[in-house]
Design a protein with these regions (language model features):
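N-terminal secretory signal peptides and thylakoid transit peptides that target proteins
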Residues: 1-17
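A general, composition-driven signal for non-globular sequence regions
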Residues: 1-2, 23, 155
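Generic macromolecular interface patches on structured domains
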Residues: 11, 19-20, 93, 338
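Cleavable N-terminal signal peptides
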Residues: 18-19, 30
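Short, conserved micro-motifs composed of acidic
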Residues: 32-347
Length: 347
């Protein structure tokens, strides 16, 4: 079993990233009369006693995929982490409904999961393709890589394979957090975090890369150079949504085993640059894991996992590759946008 910790793989790159100057425009200052931002917890189920990590939500909001740590007690987990799914089986009421509306979590089959760590799922809007990060070994794939499983005509998930082409997976380097990267006026794309050298002979750095499919073929990934994003050290995921005349970027920052929190920025379509001020999520707690969100395909909701109700606990990526007990939370994207606009004095 491959049980090596994320800290062992990512720690050196995180240290290198820390050398990048920290942004000086981060703000969490209060504004009188400004909108608040209070996470909403999903019912129990889909939450349960075994925890959920790094969820993704289907386009219709009725299916949630997430990872689960083995050490939290669910004996169905065969690797350090496996991917699970829960369904909203009664859909007549207001979302997310009550506990009676959701099915108990089920482990995805061995065509998806392995005896290595499998996590960071992202489901495509059509619900037929699941991308995720895995520690399993394969030719041309680094210590961690991006894998994909396609739903078969019978509704079952096919055998997962490494994502081919695009320089996404590179045999000696770490790749993780494969997420949508759709910007106004630009072709649909994906982004990921790559820990690799910027040029031949240079040290590894933690950077954002982008790629897109053309006629079903992934194009060569390019480092996404942006002054603001490059100034944020220890970033481990970048999530993007456009709603209410604003493109919001949510940066997950993670010093593995130490903290895992959220920062907000915005995109300027005229300059094609990301802008500040960088606004800290008001519910961040540097002793509690809470980051790595996904947005519903229509931009209606953000979903993520956090240990807010359990108090200080293990932060994911520690020396044992484990994590704390995390619950599923969500927020309407409109509230995120309103909060950021108020704090950033935009609009």
């Amino acid at each position: 079993m491959n049980s090596l910790s994320r800290r062992r793989f990512f720690g050196a790159a995180a240290a290198a990233g820390a050398a990048v100057s920290s942004p000086t425009i981060l703000t969490n200052r209060a504004h009188a009369g400004a909108p608040s931002l209070v996470p909403r917890k999903l019912p129990f189920p889909p939450n349960d006693n075994f925890g959920s990590y790094e969820p993704t939500i289907s386009a219709d909001g009725n299916t949630i995929y997430f990872a689960r740590f083995a050490h939290n007690g669910d004996t169905r987990v065969k690797g350090p982490t496996d991917i699970f799914v829960t369904h909203r089986i009664r859909q007549s009421g207001e979302w997310p409904g009550t506990a009676e509306d959701w099915s108990p979590a089920e482990r995805l089959p061995n065509t998806v999961n392995s005896d290595s760590a499998d996590q960071e799922p992202w489901i495509t809007p059509d619900g037929n393709t699941l991308y995720f990060m895995s520690f399993r070994k394969a030719p041309g794939v680094g210590p961690t890589g991006i894998w994909v499983s396609h739903k078969q005509p019978n509704g079952e998930w096919g055998q997962a394979q490494p994502v081919p082409g695009g320089n996404i997976n590179v045999s000696e380097y770490i790749t993780h957090c494969f997420m949508p990267f759709d910007l106004p006026g630009q072709p649909s794309a994906m982004c990921f975090i790559g820990i690799r050298p910027r040029e031949q002979g240079a040290p590894n750095t933690t950077d954002l890369y982008t790629t897109r499919q053309v006629d079903g073929v992934w194009q060569p990934a390019q480092r996404y150079a942006d002054r603001l994003l490059d100034s944020i050290a220890l970033k481990c995921r970048f999530s993007v949504v456009t709603r209410d005349d604003l493109t919001l970027g949510v940066v997950s920052v993670h010093d593995f085993g130490k903290f895992h929190t959220l920062l907000f920025v915005h995109y300027d379509p005229k300059s094609k640059e990301w802008k500040g001020p960088i606004v800290e999520a008001p519910f961040n707690d540097w002793n509690i894991d809470g980051a790595c969100p996904n947005f519903q395909a229509n931009g209606q909701r953000m979903i993520w996992s956090a240990g807010y109700d359990h108090g200080p606990d293990l932060i994911s990526g520690g020396k044992d590759g484990a994590g704390g007990l995390y619950d599923l939370f969500w927020l309407p994207t409109s509230e995120l946008i309103a909060y950021y606009k108020a704090r950033a004095s935009i609009g």
